[in-house]
Amino acid sequence: MAQMSMTVEKSIKADVTVSHDRVKRAYVTFLAGNKDYWMGVVGLAKGLRKVKSAYPLVVAILPDVPEEHRQILLAQGCIIREIEPVYPPENKTGYSMAYYVINYSKLRIWEFVEYEKMIYLDGDIQVFSNIDHLFDTPRGYLYAVKDCFCEISWSKTPQFKIGYCQQCPEKVTWPVESLGSPPPVYFNAGMLVFEPNLLTYEDLLRVVQITTPTYFAEQDFLNEYFTDIYKPIPSTYNLVMAMLWRHPEHIDLDQISVIHYCANGSKPWRFDETEEHMDREDIKMLVKKWWDIYEDSSLDYKNFVETESKLSPINATLASKESVGDVLISLAPSAA
């Protein structure tokens, strides 16, 4: 009996240790306003559960997110962190999309130093296989996927106009004679593996105030700021929709872990088949896959915890307590 008791005690301690480690790592996303983007965050939370991620989802929200939407996210097991907006200097040239200006507020996530490492995912992303292993990447770097210059949002850039894309640089040679040196490697900021750090956070806020805003807002800024420590990772971790019709030879959807529904009309909760390329069968299939996850009630936080508790009571109890505790702690606003 004594030996059995000791074995159980060791098992409990092991589970407690795992739970303790979990709070040092988390996924994080960003939400602003009172529109329907909360649906994307709910879909992401349920997608992470479906692939059995071991880590929670933190939602950095601006004060203008309605209480109703906050309660929906809490009910889905999300950890809410209210943050204050970050406003860059005035932009006299304009952004690719007018709403991009609010995305500078994402810089606040570097302040979340209760976590040693985080994976940022935009709210229009879905995870179709477990990517927890990215938390084990070597420290000291920022990891992200190289962007595709073939999206329509790049239409005003030289890259788009000449058909050059860093995803397939061999297709179109960069004309050094007329355009000078090719552009540096450039990542899509919809998915980032990063390490929160107060010194970095304070410097980000300082530098952004003396940096002239450019076309892609915070994405341009982050690319410039982290150019020395950026490490590319495969596009399977952030497949932007344009890759499907621009570089199909490089895509095997069965091997893709993360889909970024960023093309015009592609967001599943407001899907518009009349937009260019949205009548493609592969796009419709990916939209359906998102809805299958969103509408799966077994992936709702309450139902998921109840199911897991039957399979592993100790882990389920720890996970439930961990989320509740973090929610209570993290309701205080975060601001510099």
Swiss-Prot record:
GO terms for biological process: galactose metabolic process. GO terms for cellular component: cytoplasm. It is an enzyme of class 2 (transferase). Keywords: Carbohydrate metabolism, Cytoplasm, Galactose metabolism, Glycosyltransferase, Manganese, Metal-binding, Transferase. Pfam families: Glyco_transf_8 (PF01501). Its EC number is 2.4.1.123. Its cofactor is a divalent metal cation. Transmembrane segments: none annotated. GO terms for molecular function: inositol 3-alpha-galactosyltransferase activity; metal ion binding. It catalyses: myo-inositol + UDP-alpha-D-galactose = alpha-D-galactosyl-(1->3)-1D-myo-inositol + UDP + H(+). The active site is at K106. Signal peptide: none annotated. Mn(2+) binds at D122, D124, H260. It is found in: Cytoplasm. Belongs to the glycosyltransferase 8 family. Galactosyltransferase subfamily. PANTHER family: GLYCOGENIN SUBFAMILY MEMBER. Galactinol synthase involved in the biosynthesis of raffinose family oligosaccharides (RFOs) that function as osmoprotectants. May promote plant stress tolerance. This is Galactinol synthase 6. It comes from Arabidopsis thaliana (Mouse-ear cress).
